[in-house]
Amino acid sequence: MRKITLIVIHCSAVRPNQTSSAAQIDEWHKERVTHGIHWKGIGYHYVVRRDGTVEIGRHLADPGAHCVGHNRHSIGICYEGGLNAEGLEVDTRTPEQVRALRELVEKMHTYFPEALIVGHHDLNPSKTCPCFDAVHEYWDLQPVR
């Protein structure tokens, strides 16, 4: 297994009337091309739907494709949403998503207790994703340094 030092939280940047299942994100990512190379598929390891359902993306043993410079040593978790009806980037998590994200992050923390839990914007300041402060939200799970 890879050495995991980060658990990175993302949003899928869709409006309330749009969906983003793991299968849909997989298709979107396969359509992307970087430096002339097509992406292999979904870059996240998990997707948390609005109803709290957790869908599997990439296998945990495989590096993600969700945060430039950090994929080899991180787990990527994406929640469905992140945009309001007007397209503004805001925290749109449902109570079911908040609960499911918490449970999933706690589970990942048991597997990778030394991993920092961060939002995408903590590693790439030009991003607002995931539209909430993941470091603060999961402060009780952060490793003691």
Residues covered by each model-derived region:
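Short amphipathic alpha-helices and their capping/turn segments at secondary-structure boundaries
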Residues: 61-68
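Basic/polar, cationic surfaces and motifs that engage anionic cell-wall
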Residues: 1-12, 50-54, 70-75, 80-145
